[in-house]
Swiss-Prot record:
It is found in: Periplasm. Belongs to the DMSP lyase DddY family. Its EC number is 4.4.1.3. It catalyses: S,S-dimethyl-beta-propiothetin = acrylate + dimethyl sulfide + H(+). Keywords: Lyase, Periplasm, Signal. InterPro entries: DimsulpropLyDddY, DMSP_lyase, RmlC-like_jellyroll. Catalyzes the cleavage of dimethylsulfoniopropionate (DMSP) into dimethyl sulfide (DMS) and acrylate. DMS is the principal form by which sulfur is transported from oceans to the atmosphere. Disruption phenotype: Cells are unable to produce dimethyl sulfide (DMS) from dimethylsulfoniopropionate (DMSP). Cells however grow normally on DMSP as sole carbon source. NCBIfam families: DimsulpropLyDddY. GO terms for cellular component: periplasmic space. This is Dimethylsulfoniopropionate lyase DddY. It comes from Alcaligenes faecalis. One of its GO terms (molecular function) is dimethylpropiothetin dethiomethylase activity. Pfam families: DMSP_lyase.
Protein backbone atom coordinates (compact mmCIF):
# COMPACT_ATOMS: atom_id res chain seq x y z
CA UNK A 1 0.00 0.00 0.00
CA UNK A 2 2.81 2.36 0.96
CA UNK A 3 4.60 1.59 -2.32
CA UNK A 4 1.45 2.42 -4.30
CA UNK A 5 1.03 5.68 -2.39
CA UNK A 6 4.68 6.57 -2.90
CA UNK A 7 4.40 5.73 -6.59
CA UNK A 8 1.36 7.97 -6.92
CA UNK A 9 3.13 10.82 -5.15
CA UNK A 10 6.16 10.48 -7.43
CA UNK A 11 3.98 10.36 -10.53
CA UNK A 12 2.12 13.46 -9.38
CA UNK A 13 5.36 15.25 -8.66
CA UNK A 14 6.70 14.35 -12.10
CA UNK A 15 3.51 15.56 -13.77
CA UNK A 16 3.74 18.82 -11.84
CA UNK A 17 7.40 19.16 -12.79
CA UNK A 18 6.60 18.59 -16.46
CA UNK A 19 4.03 21.37 -16.42
CA UNK A 20 6.26 23.73 -14.47
CA UNK A 21 9.21 23.00 -16.76
CA UNK A 22 7.37 23.98 -19.95
CA UNK A 23 9.46 25.78 -22.54
CA UNK A 24 7.63 28.32 -24.69
CA UNK A 25 8.82 29.27 -28.16
CA UNK A 26 7.13 32.37 -29.52
CA UNK A 27 6.47 33.02 -33.17
CA UNK A 28 9.29 34.83 -34.91
CA UNK A 29 7.25 38.02 -35.28
CA UNK A 30 6.83 38.49 -31.52
CA UNK A 31 9.41 41.12 -30.55
CA UNK A 32 9.97 42.80 -27.16
CA UNK A 33 8.63 46.35 -27.19
CA UNK A 34 10.13 49.32 -25.38
CA UNK A 35 7.24 50.72 -23.33
CA UNK A 36 6.94 52.76 -20.16
CA UNK A 37 5.89 51.45 -16.76
CA UNK A 38 2.46 53.05 -17.19
CA UNK A 39 2.02 51.46 -20.60
CA UNK A 40 3.03 48.11 -19.14
CA UNK A 41 0.16 48.39 -16.67
CA UNK A 42 -2.23 48.73 -19.62
CA UNK A 43 -0.75 45.64 -21.27
CA UNK A 44 -0.95 43.77 -17.96
CA UNK A 45 -4.70 44.44 -17.72
CA UNK A 46 -5.18 43.16 -21.28
CA UNK A 47 -3.14 40.05 -20.40
CA UNK A 48 -5.05 39.45 -17.17
CA UNK A 49 -8.42 39.45 -18.94
CA UNK A 50 -6.99 37.29 -21.72
CA UNK A 51 -6.02 34.66 -19.16
CA UNK A 52 -9.56 34.68 -17.75
CA UNK A 53 -10.98 34.13 -21.23
CA UNK A 54 -8.62 31.23 -21.97
CA UNK A 55 -9.16 29.65 -18.55
CA UNK A 56 -12.92 29.86 -18.90
CA UNK A 57 -12.81 28.36 -22.39
CA UNK A 58 -10.77 25.43 -21.09
CA UNK A 59 -13.09 24.98 -18.12
CA UNK A 60 -16.15 24.99 -20.38
CA UNK A 61 -14.58 22.26 -22.53
CA UNK A 62 -13.75 20.05 -19.56
CA UNK A 63 -16.95 20.47 -17.53
CA UNK A 64 -19.29 17.49 -18.17
CA UNK A 65 -22.59 18.23 -19.91
CA UNK A 66 -25.25 16.10 -21.58
CA UNK A 67 -24.33 12.41 -21.69
CA UNK A 68 -20.61 13.02 -21.18
CA UNK A 69 -18.91 12.29 -17.87
CA UNK A 70 -15.47 13.77 -18.57
CA UNK A 71 -16.10 16.79 -20.81
CA UNK A 72 -18.72 18.90 -22.52
CA UNK A 73 -21.03 17.33 -25.09
CA UNK A 74 -20.73 18.97 -28.51
CA UNK A 75 -22.95 18.78 -31.56
CA UNK A 76 -20.84 17.48 -34.46
CA UNK A 77 -23.70 17.16 -36.97
CA UNK A 78 -27.02 18.96 -36.72
CA UNK A 79 -28.55 16.25 -38.92
CA UNK A 80 -27.37 12.65 -39.23
CA UNK A 81 -29.06 10.65 -41.99
CA UNK A 82 -28.95 7.34 -40.14
CA UNK A 83 -30.96 8.65 -37.21
CA UNK A 84 -32.70 11.71 -38.59
CA UNK A 85 -31.40 13.56 -35.53
CA UNK A 86 -28.37 15.53 -34.43
CA UNK A 87 -25.11 13.70 -33.72
CA UNK A 88 -23.08 14.55 -30.62
CA UNK A 89 -19.76 13.55 -29.11
CA UNK A 90 -17.84 14.25 -25.92
CA UNK A 91 -15.52 16.96 -27.12
CA UNK A 92 -12.39 15.84 -25.29
CA UNK A 93 -12.52 12.52 -27.15
CA UNK A 94 -10.90 14.34 -30.06
CA UNK A 95 -7.10 14.22 -30.03
CA UNK A 96 -6.75 17.77 -31.36
CA UNK A 97 -8.86 19.05 -28.46
CA UNK A 98 -6.75 17.08 -25.98
CA UNK A 99 -3.66 18.83 -27.31
CA UNK A 100 -5.38 22.22 -27.24
CA UNK A 101 -6.34 21.66 -23.60
CA UNK A 102 -2.82 20.49 -22.76
CA UNK A 103 -1.30 23.65 -24.21
CA UNK A 104 -3.81 25.93 -22.49
CA UNK A 105 -2.98 24.26 -19.19
CA UNK A 106 0.70 24.98 -19.77
CA UNK A 107 -0.10 28.65 -20.40
CA UNK A 108 -2.26 28.90 -17.29
CA UNK A 109 0.30 27.05 -15.15
CA UNK A 110 3.11 29.43 -16.08
CA UNK A 111 1.55 32.70 -17.23
CA UNK A 112 4.75 34.67 -16.71
CA UNK A 113 6.59 32.47 -19.22
CA UNK A 114 3.71 32.51 -21.69
CA UNK A 115 3.43 36.29 -21.39
CA UNK A 116 6.70 36.62 -23.32
CA UNK A 117 4.67 35.62 -26.40
CA UNK A 118 1.90 38.17 -25.76
CA UNK A 119 1.73 41.15 -28.08
CA UNK A 120 -0.94 43.87 -27.72
CA UNK A 121 -0.52 44.35 -31.49
CA UNK A 122 -0.29 48.10 -31.20
CA UNK A 123 1.97 48.18 -34.25
CA UNK A 124 1.01 44.94 -36.01
CA UNK A 125 2.30 44.78 -39.58
CA UNK A 126 0.67 41.70 -41.17
CA UNK A 127 -2.73 43.31 -41.81
CA UNK A 128 -4.90 46.04 -40.36
CA UNK A 129 -6.65 45.37 -37.06
CA UNK A 130 -9.55 47.55 -35.97
CA UNK A 131 -11.61 48.66 -32.99
CA UNK A 132 -15.37 48.73 -33.75
CA UNK A 133 -16.11 52.31 -32.63
CA UNK A 134 -15.03 55.18 -30.41
CA UNK A 135 -17.61 54.01 -27.86
CA UNK A 136 -15.92 50.61 -27.69
CA UNK A 137 -12.47 52.20 -27.61
CA UNK A 138 -13.48 54.23 -24.56
CA UNK A 139 -14.34 51.08 -22.61
CA UNK A 140 -10.72 50.73 -21.53
CA UNK A 141 -7.56 52.78 -21.19
CA UNK A 142 -5.72 49.95 -22.94
CA UNK A 143 -7.84 50.24 -26.07
CA UNK A 144 -7.41 54.02 -26.07
CA UNK A 145 -3.62 53.57 -25.82
CA UNK A 146 -3.48 50.97 -28.62
CA UNK A 147 -5.50 53.42 -30.74
CA UNK A 148 -6.50 51.13 -33.60
CA UNK A 149 -8.34 52.57 -36.60
CA UNK A 150 -12.12 52.47 -36.17
CA UNK A 151 -14.44 50.23 -38.15
CA UNK A 152 -17.05 52.99 -38.14
CA UNK A 153 -14.62 55.09 -40.21
CA UNK A 154 -13.78 52.11 -42.44
CA UNK A 155 -17.43 51.44 -43.28
CA UNK A 156 -18.29 55.13 -43.67
CA UNK A 157 -15.60 55.37 -46.33
CA UNK A 158 -16.80 52.14 -47.99
CA UNK A 159 -20.40 53.33 -48.29
CA UNK A 160 -23.19 51.50 -50.09
CA UNK A 161 -25.13 48.56 -48.65
CA UNK A 162 -22.00 46.93 -47.22
CA UNK A 163 -21.00 50.15 -45.51
CA UNK A 164 -24.51 50.64 -44.11
CA UNK A 165 -24.52 47.14 -42.58
CA UNK A 166 -21.03 47.65 -41.19
CA UNK A 167 -22.07 50.90 -39.57
CA UNK A 168 -25.18 49.28 -38.11
CA UNK A 169 -23.05 46.56 -36.52
CA UNK A 170 -20.19 48.69 -35.27
CA UNK A 171 -22.14 51.74 -34.09
CA UNK A 172 -24.24 49.31 -32.02
CA UNK A 173 -21.41 46.88 -31.22
CA UNK A 174 -21.69 47.31 -27.46
CA UNK A 175 -25.46 46.74 -27.45
CA UNK A 176 -25.19 43.71 -29.74
CA UNK A 177 -22.37 42.03 -27.82
CA UNK A 178 -24.10 42.73 -24.50
CA UNK A 179 -27.17 40.62 -25.39
CA UNK A 180 -25.48 37.64 -23.79
CA UNK A 181 -26.07 35.18 -20.98
CA UNK A 182 -23.09 33.26 -19.61
CA UNK A 183 -24.69 31.83 -16.48
CA UNK A 184 -25.27 28.28 -17.75
CA UNK A 185 -21.74 27.19 -18.72
CA UNK A 186 -19.32 29.79 -17.39
CA UNK A 187 -18.19 30.67 -13.88
CA UNK A 188 -17.08 34.13 -15.07
CA UNK A 189 -18.75 36.44 -17.55
CA UNK A 190 -16.56 36.14 -20.66
CA UNK A 191 -18.64 38.60 -22.69
CA UNK A 192 -17.86 42.27 -23.21
CA UNK A 193 -19.80 42.94 -20.00
CA UNK A 194 -17.35 40.92 -17.91
CA UNK A 195 -14.11 41.47 -19.85
CA UNK A 196 -14.37 44.98 -21.34
CA UNK A 197 -10.62 45.51 -21.70
CA UNK A 198 -10.23 42.30 -23.70
CA UNK A 199 -13.15 42.88 -26.06
CA UNK A 200 -12.23 46.53 -26.68
CA UNK A 201 -8.47 45.96 -27.03
CA UNK A 202 -8.32 42.84 -29.20
CA UNK A 203 -8.00 43.55 -32.91
CA UNK A 204 -11.15 43.04 -34.99
CA UNK A 205 -11.19 41.98 -38.65
CA UNK A 206 -13.98 42.72 -41.18
CA UNK A 207 -13.42 39.33 -42.75
CA UNK A 208 -15.76 39.49 -45.74
CA UNK A 209 -16.28 43.20 -46.37
CA UNK A 210 -14.06 43.17 -49.46
CA UNK A 211 -14.84 39.62 -50.63
CA UNK A 212 -17.43 39.67 -53.46
CA UNK A 213 -17.94 35.88 -53.19
CA UNK A 214 -19.22 36.06 -49.60
CA UNK A 215 -22.95 36.38 -50.08
CA UNK A 216 -25.25 39.32 -49.45
CA UNK A 217 -24.01 42.85 -48.87
CA UNK A 218 -25.62 42.91 -45.45
CA UNK A 219 -23.71 39.81 -44.37
CA UNK A 220 -20.44 41.09 -45.81
CA UNK A 221 -20.75 44.26 -43.76
CA UNK A 222 -22.22 42.49 -40.76
CA UNK A 223 -19.52 40.01 -39.80
CA UNK A 224 -16.42 40.40 -37.60
CA UNK A 225 -13.95 38.15 -35.87
CA UNK A 226 -11.08 38.67 -33.47
CA UNK A 227 -8.18 36.39 -32.58
CA UNK A 228 -6.76 36.46 -29.07
CA UNK A 229 -4.50 33.39 -29.29
CA UNK A 230 -3.06 31.92 -32.46
CA UNK A 231 -0.77 32.66 -35.41
CA UNK A 232 -2.40 36.06 -36.04
CA UNK A 233 -3.54 36.90 -32.51
CA UNK A 234 -2.11 38.52 -29.42
CA UNK A 235 -0.71 35.36 -27.84
CA UNK A 236 1.46 33.86 -30.57
CA UNK A 237 3.10 30.67 -29.27
CA UNK A 238 4.75 28.50 -31.89
CA UNK A 239 5.74 25.55 -29.69
CA UNK A 240 5.54 24.32 -26.11
CA UNK A 241 8.22 21.80 -25.21
CA UNK A 242 8.91 21.32 -28.91
CA UNK A 243 5.27 20.52 -29.71
CA UNK A 244 3.42 22.67 -32.23
CA UNK A 245 0.64 24.75 -30.69
CA UNK A 246 -2.49 24.55 -32.81
CA UNK A 247 -4.79 26.57 -30.56
CA UNK A 248 -6.44 29.57 -32.22
CA UNK A 249 -8.98 31.21 -29.92
CA UNK A 250 -11.05 34.36 -30.24
CA UNK A 251 -14.59 35.60 -30.79
CA UNK A 252 -17.05 36.25 -33.62
CA UNK A 253 -19.98 38.63 -34.14
CA UNK A 254 -22.62 38.29 -36.88
CA UNK A 255 -25.32 40.93 -37.34
CA UNK A 256 -28.98 39.87 -37.19
CA UNK A 257 -30.97 39.47 -40.42
CA UNK A 258 -28.00 37.93 -42.26
CA UNK A 259 -27.04 34.52 -43.59
CA UNK A 260 -23.46 33.18 -43.52
CA UNK A 261 -23.33 30.88 -46.58
CA UNK A 262 -22.17 27.27 -46.54
CA UNK A 263 -18.42 27.07 -46.00
CA UNK A 264 -15.71 24.69 -44.81
CA UNK A 265 -11.99 24.51 -43.96
CA UNK A 266 -9.25 22.10 -42.97
CA UNK A 267 -8.83 23.17 -39.31
CA UNK A 268 -11.25 21.72 -36.78
CA UNK A 269 -13.36 24.42 -35.14
CA UNK A 270 -15.54 25.05 -32.10
CA UNK A 271 -18.20 27.64 -31.32
CA UNK A 272 -19.70 28.41 -27.92
CA UNK A 273 -22.82 30.56 -28.21
CA UNK A 274 -23.04 33.61 -25.93
CA UNK A 275 -26.09 35.37 -27.40
CA UNK A 276 -29.40 34.90 -25.62
CA UNK A 277 -31.88 34.72 -28.53
CA UNK A 278 -34.90 37.01 -28.52
CA UNK A 279 -36.97 34.27 -30.14
CA UNK A 280 -36.42 30.53 -30.43
CA UNK A 281 -35.36 30.57 -34.07
CA UNK A 282 -33.37 33.81 -34.10
CA UNK A 283 -30.01 32.14 -34.70
CA UNK A 284 -29.94 28.92 -36.71
CA UNK A 285 -26.90 26.93 -37.74
CA UNK A 286 -25.99 23.68 -39.45
CA UNK A 287 -22.96 21.44 -39.59
CA UNK A 288 -22.80 18.20 -41.57
CA UNK A 289 -19.87 16.11 -42.73
CA UNK A 290 -18.92 16.72 -46.35
CA UNK A 291 -19.58 13.07 -47.19
CA UNK A 292 -23.13 13.08 -45.80
CA UNK A 293 -25.57 11.22 -48.03
CA UNK A 294 -27.74 14.35 -47.88
CA UNK A 295 -25.27 15.75 -50.43
CA UNK A 296 -23.91 14.50 -53.76
CA UNK A 297 -20.13 13.98 -54.01
CA UNK A 298 -17.94 13.68 -57.13
CA UNK A 299 -14.20 13.04 -56.95
CA UNK A 300 -11.96 15.80 -58.35
CA UNK A 301 -8.18 16.09 -58.77
CA UNK A 302 -7.47 17.43 -55.28
CA UNK A 303 -10.63 16.64 -53.38
CA UNK A 304 -14.38 16.38 -53.89
CA UNK A 305 -17.05 18.45 -55.55
CA UNK A 306 -19.96 18.45 -53.11
CA UNK A 307 -23.39 19.48 -54.38
CA UNK A 308 -25.91 20.68 -51.83
CA UNK A 309 -29.59 20.94 -52.70
CA UNK A 310 -31.59 22.54 -49.91
CA UNK A 311 -34.55 23.38 -52.14
CA UNK A 312 -38.17 22.51 -51.35
CA UNK A 313 -37.36 23.35 -47.72
CA UNK A 314 -35.03 20.34 -47.34
CA UNK A 315 -32.57 22.68 -45.65
CA UNK A 316 -34.85 23.21 -42.67
CA UNK A 317 -34.26 19.72 -41.28
CA UNK A 318 -30.51 20.30 -41.40
CA UNK A 319 -30.54 23.41 -39.21
CA UNK A 320 -30.82 23.74 -35.43
CA UNK A 321 -31.64 26.69 -33.17
CA UNK A 322 -28.71 28.01 -31.17
CA UNK A 323 -29.06 29.07 -27.56
CA UNK A 324 -26.85 29.62 -24.52
CA UNK A 325 -28.04 26.57 -22.58
CA UNK A 326 -28.62 23.38 -24.60
CA UNK A 327 -27.48 24.02 -28.19
CA UNK A 328 -24.47 26.08 -27.12
CA UNK A 329 -21.41 24.06 -28.18
CA UNK A 330 -20.56 22.71 -31.60
CA UNK A 331 -17.44 21.05 -33.04
CA UNK A 332 -16.68 21.00 -36.75
CA UNK A 333 -14.48 18.18 -38.01
CA UNK A 334 -12.11 18.81 -40.93
CA UNK A 335 -14.00 19.89 -44.07
CA UNK A 336 -17.36 19.75 -42.30
CA UNK A 337 -19.80 21.98 -44.17
CA UNK A 338 -21.48 24.55 -41.97
CA UNK A 339 -23.52 27.75 -42.07
CA UNK A 340 -25.04 30.34 -39.72
CA UNK A 341 -28.49 31.60 -40.63
CA UNK A 342 -30.11 34.55 -38.86
CA UNK A 343 -33.00 35.46 -41.15
CA UNK A 344 -35.96 33.66 -39.61
CA UNK A 345 -38.50 34.56 -36.93
CA UNK A 346 -37.89 37.79 -35.07
CA UNK A 347 -34.87 38.77 -37.19
CA UNK A 348 -37.24 40.87 -39.28
CA UNK A 349 -38.36 42.98 -36.33
CA UNK A 350 -35.58 43.11 -33.71
CA UNK A 351 -32.81 45.71 -33.46
CA UNK A 352 -29.25 45.75 -32.14
CA UNK A 353 -28.85 42.01 -32.03
CA UNK A 354 -26.89 39.23 -33.67
CA UNK A 355 -24.90 36.11 -32.94
CA UNK A 356 -21.92 36.41 -30.58
CA UNK A 357 -19.72 33.40 -29.90
CA UNK A 358 -16.47 32.20 -28.40
CA UNK A 359 -14.65 30.83 -31.43
CA UNK A 360 -11.65 28.51 -31.67
CA UNK A 361 -9.67 26.29 -34.01
CA UNK A 362 -7.35 23.53 -32.87
CA UNK A 363 -4.90 22.89 -35.73
CA UNK A 364 -3.63 26.28 -36.86
CA UNK A 365 -0.22 25.06 -37.99
CA UNK A 366 -1.08 22.36 -40.53
CA UNK A 367 -2.81 22.10 -43.91
CA UNK A 368 -4.67 25.05 -45.45
CA UNK A 369 -5.88 27.58 -42.90
CA UNK A 370 -8.23 29.80 -44.83
CA UNK A 371 -12.01 29.46 -44.81
CA UNK A 372 -13.38 28.29 -48.16
CA UNK A 373 -16.80 29.56 -49.22
CA UNK A 374 -19.14 27.40 -51.25
CA UNK A 375 -20.52 28.85 -54.49
CA UNK A 376 -24.00 29.08 -55.99
CA UNK A 377 -24.72 26.33 -58.52
CA UNK A 378 -26.41 28.94 -60.72
CA UNK A 379 -23.12 30.81 -61.21
CA UNK A 380 -21.50 34.02 -59.90
CA UNK A 381 -24.63 36.09 -60.47
CA UNK A 382 -26.30 34.17 -57.65
CA UNK A 383 -23.77 35.06 -54.95
CA UNK A 384 -25.78 37.82 -53.31
CA UNK A 385 -28.84 35.58 -53.15
CA UNK A 386 -27.08 32.64 -51.47
CA UNK A 387 -29.35 31.06 -48.87
CA UNK A 388 -29.63 27.52 -47.44
CA UNK A 389 -32.49 26.76 -49.83
CA UNK A 390 -30.46 27.49 -52.96
CA UNK A 391 -28.41 24.85 -54.76
CA UNK A 392 -24.78 25.22 -53.75
CA UNK A 393 -21.45 23.67 -54.72
CA UNK A 394 -18.50 23.19 -52.36
CA UNK A 395 -15.07 22.37 -53.82
CA UNK A 396 -13.74 20.46 -50.82
CA UNK A 397 -9.99 19.92 -50.80
CA UNK A 398 -8.10 16.93 -49.45
CA UNK A 399 -6.18 17.47 -46.23
CA UNK A 400 -3.02 15.78 -45.01
CA UNK A 401 -3.18 13.73 -41.77
Amino acid sequence: MQKRMLGGMVAGALACFQVQAAQFQCQDDVKPAAISAEEQKLVDQFWAESLVYLEQYLKALETPTGQCKDSAQATIQTYHSETGKAQTRCIMKYRDMELLAKHLKAVLAEPDKAKACFDPQKNYKEFTLYTPSSQVQQLSATSTWINRPLLTDYYTKMGGAIGAAGLELNENFLAITSRTDTTAHWTRDVSIKGLPTLWSSVGWVPLYAENPAAGSDRFRGGYLYAELMGPWGNLRIKEINGEKVGAEIGMTVQLFNTSYPFHYHHPQETYMTLTKPQCVDQNKYMVMHWDSDQFTQTRSDKGWTVEIDGSKERWKKWFANQDVNKEWLTYFERNAIHAFHALEGCNQTIQNSGLVAVWARSTSQDNEQFTQLCRPASGPDGVKRMRPGQKTVCDVRDWKP
